[in-house]
């Protein structure tokens, strides 16, 4: 699932919207969820996992998606792993609900590709290393691979070898509306339900509605990949897909390193001056410590705008207070500010002013030429120009053409005549 389709901490209020409650069920040793549209197995024991591994061994392609919790804990964690498999034969076992289920949309093309859906609980006391080993040998179908690959790498130390990203495939076909919901509607005429996006996926038991919502994210991926692959084959662009998917794997394997001296520089901090900046830095670090100790997102402790207001208030002589603070937290909050205010001016952080360096005339000329080539290729190929090369990439190559091989895959380089 793409990052844009997921909720983020930055936009949340102090009291995030709670998921609508439905009839909850416990996670027993065996469970089969039967809805009008789904029959799936929930994997929460080693025995269930063993049966799933047997099924994975018989297929070449596996659809995978994840659900994470970053709204209710300090560090984002993997909470659910959804898996869909093509069914080659009727096999009794986990999630078996009789004859092979062929999907809710009888008469549609994906009826010819029966499948089974499973939900693996990473929070259960089950060793998932055998699952990772099994998946590494398969082609993994994902929708917006970057988020899921990074989460699986952090949570399970899993690294995919081959992927089929349905977002990349759709964009190669010139499809502008490439959200999962849009693609499922386009190819299968099915409206995916909404909801549970802000739910607490780390809470147990999960509701039946939450699990149905989660499995929606893989249920259509295999037939969708079949449709997209067929169209790309007709256009002789399957190699383009392989190149871009391999690059996605490589990029997801690179750990994003953030400058520790940048983390506390939140939006609005540039308006602070002198001692206010020192207090903000101290309060930000205090909030991080409190959030980690409580295993809650930082915005549950204090929101960014409240940090900014508190920094200016302390320096002006006021004593900001918040009703939801315990006496211990209130004392630590004020102590952090007092300690920062005792720092000598030489230890105050300096707010950085960013001034762009205007590129030279030759660099501008090269950038304009690259844009012209890109836009012409985009029109000829019926692709979005930014999918061939975004503006930042154009500017980087105009400055240093040798970085083209790092920033672009071969088909993109060819489109720019590099």
Which residue stretches match the model-derived regions?
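Short hydrophobic/aromatic-rich motifs at helix boundaries and adjacent loops
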Residues: 53, 100, 120-124, 152-156, ...
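Generic structural signal for short, solvent-exposed loop/turn connectors between secondary structure elements
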Residues: 10, 15-19, 34-42, 88-91, ...
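Conserved DEDDh/DEDDy metal-dependent 3′-5′ exonuclease domain
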Residues: 40-62, 69-94, 113-231
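Intrinsic disorder/low-complexity segments
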Residues: 2-39, 87-115
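Short N-terminal alpha-helical targeting/association segments
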Residues: 6, 14-16, 57, 157, ...
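Short aromatic/hydrophobic-glycine micro-motifs
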Residues: 61, 99, 188-190, 237, ...
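Accessory DNA-binding and partner-docking regions appended to nucleic-acid-acting proteins
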Residues: 208, 228-418
